[in-house]
């Protein structure tokens, strides 16, 4: 699945995926056990793990809320200097807590759908693409590693901000619970991220096989092309799997995007208040741009993974057009290629959330621009206090 174990990137990706799996089991956000009795390993939904995950994560959230109210008496100097910053920080905190409550409820409510998706991925991996697992997909490994690094970077950035902010008297339990909640939410998003990347990897493998088939037909027109029917069937299943994945995670991903973009606003506003209003010049200010860059990197990885899958589907249509340039074409080959091309033109890999917007690079860029426009509006609104 990950290529040669001697290569560092496939090895790192494999270890990071294992860590994600064990961490998800530990926090109860992947409530499935492995049923190894069947020829192809399948996942079985565990009621105990489902209940354990719901109770554990809700307990952590409500404990975090209680501790936050207990230790809210001490106010940061930045909040005294700028009440708008305090208001924004409270609103972002409420958004994050509500997002956590909804995400964990959706994880519980939609666990059956997620189980079906995972079992379909296992069938594709160990049955349909079994002979192609030796082919290394560089983008898959790269994106998995980067996503895990951003999760680690966010946790380190959160710790840095809590230690670096002047006048902040933090409670270690509050910080640890906040990190645990953030880690749990990131693992939920990681499941979607890996699902998208696996679909991309399978489309990429189909494209590579189609390219090989084109090369063989150019050299030998009598080459067996019956595999096109198999690729067409797999492509249909991947399109359906993509649709199910988007439906299962559309609310979680929408909340994730809202939380990420709104978090970027408050980080920049903190930097403006400390740097311009309070004229506090110290090394700790580096923590704010560092946190901002990690958040944008994490946000863009999710956008780029979806965009990569869309482009892989578009590339399939381009490869199929090459078949029309072949000489000595067979009628059956032409019929198979036309059917495949029709499917590619009428059904595409799209990641539209809640029917509102698509996740691709163009829309991701618009979201980032919109975030900074909101920031400009806040600066204009609160200009006299800055």
Curated annotation (Swiss-Prot):
Expressed in taste bristles in the foreleg and labial palps. In larvae, is expressed in neurons of the dorsal and posterior pharyngeal sense organs. Expressed in taste neurons that mediate sensitivity to bitter compounds. It is found in: Cell membrane. It comes from Drosophila melanogaster (Fruit fly). GO terms for biological process: detection of chemical stimulus involved in sensory perception of taste; monoatomic ion transmembrane transport; signal transduction. Signal peptide: none annotated. This is Putative gustatory receptor 22b. Belongs to the insect chemoreceptor superfamily. Gustatory receptor (GR) family. Gr22e subfamily. PANTHER family: GUSTATORY AND ODORANT RECEPTOR 63A-RELATED, INVERTEBRATE GUSTATORY RECEPTOR. One of its GO terms (cellular component) is axon. Residues 1-48, 111-155, 200-254, 304-363 are cytoplasmic. Residues 70-89, 177-178, 276-282, 385-386 are extracellular. Pfam families: 7tm_7. Probable gustatory receptor which mediates acceptance or avoidance behavior, depending on its substrates. Seems to be involved in the sensing of bitter taste since it is expressed in neurons that mediate sensitivity to bitter compounds. It is a multi-pass membrane protein. One of its GO terms (molecular function) is ligand-gated monoatomic ion channel activity. Keywords: Cell membrane, Membrane, Receptor, Transducer, Transmembrane, Transmembrane helix. The chain crosses the membrane at residues 49-69, 90-110, 156-176, 179-199, 255-275, 283-303, 364-384.
